[in-house]
Design a protein with these regions (language model features):
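Short, contiguous strand/loop micro-motifs
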Residues: 7-8, 31-33, 76-79, 113-115, ...
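Active-site acidic/histidine proton-transfer and metal-coordination neighborhood
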Residues: 73-168, 258-260
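Histidine-acidic metal/acid-base catalytic patches
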Residues: 1-28, 38, 50, 98-100, ...
């Protein structure tokens, strides 16, 4: 069955970072993820994961200056040295804790579009060479933040083809819907490209069941087209996190039925 991954940057934020993995395990999640878990040294994180029977799904590299709304460094011309240092830090952490993916966020470039595109391609190429032999793969995600360089699922898929599938896509149901895509249809057509999934309902970006998305269709599309990776929950809880996760038993039953059918 697919691992169900709690994004502990969004969930359990009332708790210290070190206490969030245990809370996720108690509520029935089988994996966790966080963009910048550096406050917990890799040795401590690995021990926590082993004790709780969890895996770590994906980590982000090079977020840049959050106060300036950079949202990543990969497409920011002139920041290549900082990008590489951040990527190496994330890759080392991922290898140490057995995490399969690093997501180098593209960011919100301030310069020309062509310069940003060239910088992004060069940084992505460098990152792909860096992960060779590590057991870790690179993720690329289309994100609907205004000005974000990788803001199109079509562009992400095109880039995936141009790089001959050397990285995987992070598919987010909320962002897909904002981009006027049918998440189930897109997942069916592109499942071979997907390495990780993020779940949030739309509108509102809250837990499943609070919006209009037909998650049964989305899960069926992923299942029928061979997706076996983790399903991450990157939503803003509309209630306390544990209460918001009440859907988990039903999702586990659904996924178990689909796997056994």
């Amino acid at each position: 069955m697919n691992r169900l991954s709690a994004h502990i940057g969004y969930l359990y934020t009332d708790l210290p970072l070190a206490e969030r993995p245990a809370a996720a395990a108690r509520d029935g999640f089988t994996a966790i993820e966080h963009p910048e878990p550096w406050a917990l040294p890799a040795k401590e994180m690995r021990a926590l994961l082993a004790d709780l029977g969890l895996t770590f799904s994906q980590v982000t590299s090079g977020m840049g200056d959050a106060g300036k709304g950079e949202k990543g460094l990969a497409a920011l011309t002139g920041r290549e040295t900082e990008f590489r240092a951040g990527f190496d830090r994330a890759l080392d952490y991922a290898v140490a804790i057995g995490c399969p993916f690093v997501h180098p966020m593209a960011g919100v470039p301030k310069g020309g579009v062509l310069d940003a595109a060239e910088t992004y391609r060069l940084n992505l190429s460098w990152a792909l060479s860096r992960v060779e032999g590590s057991g870790v793969r690179v993720l690329v995600e289309a994100i609907t933040i205004p000005g974000y360089h990788m803001g199109s699922l079509a562009l992400a898929a095109q880039l995936h083809d141009q790089f001959h599938g050397r990285f995987d896509l992070l598919f987010d149901t909320y962002h897909a819907t904002v981009l006027a895509e049918d998440p189930a249809r897109w997942a069916a057509q592109n499942a071979r490209r997907i390495g990780h999934v993020h779940i949030a309902d739309h509108p509102g970006r809250h837990e499943p069941g609070t919006g209009a998305l037909a998650f049964d269709r989305i899960l069926t599309a992923l299942r029928d087209h061979g997706y076996v990776g983790a399903i991450g929950f990157e939503y803003v809880p509309s209630v306390a996190t544990s209460a918001s996760a009440a859907f988990l038993p039903g999702w586990k039953r659904l996924l178990s039925e689909k796997v056994s059918s």
